[in-house]
């Protein structure tokens, strides 16, 4: 059976989450009237401002950073960063009210990814404790002989 490190699994889940966000946004462009609305300088009836664009950039940059942080952060910081960020994004995407079937589909996929990130990070046990206990067992075994 193929085993994958927890860091790689969490990073892959963030990539899956990002792909769903990106393709949902791309999908919006084929919705009738979407491009025309954007060309008027509004989105969902709200004016498109520099602040709104900056907020959108920050909101997408956090999951992008989590792809990298999931690979690079040490165990404790990694585990809690994944739990906290995934929980915050879960609340955020749940607050988006939508009735479009394609949006609902992507929302379900994003929610599933975030749930699995939280579940995986929560169940993740400190690998150094396991290594330490294994080395203690090895030392104990040598002393008995």
Which sequence ranges carry the predicted segments?
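Structural signature of hydrophobic alpha-helical transmembrane segments
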Residues: 50-58, 108
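Core segments of transmembrane alpha-helices
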Residues: 58-66, 86, 110
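Hydrophobic transmembrane helix segments
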Residues: 17-51
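Juxtamembrane helix-break-helix junctions at the cytosolic face
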Residues: 60-80
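Alpha-helical membrane-associated segments of multi-pass integral membrane proteins
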Residues: 102-120
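Cytosolic juxtamembrane helix and N-cap/initiation of the first transmembrane helix
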Residues: 1-20
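Membrane-helix boundary connector in multi-pass membrane proteins
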Residues: 78, 89-107
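Membrane-water interface at the C-terminal end of transmembrane alpha helices
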Residues: 114-135
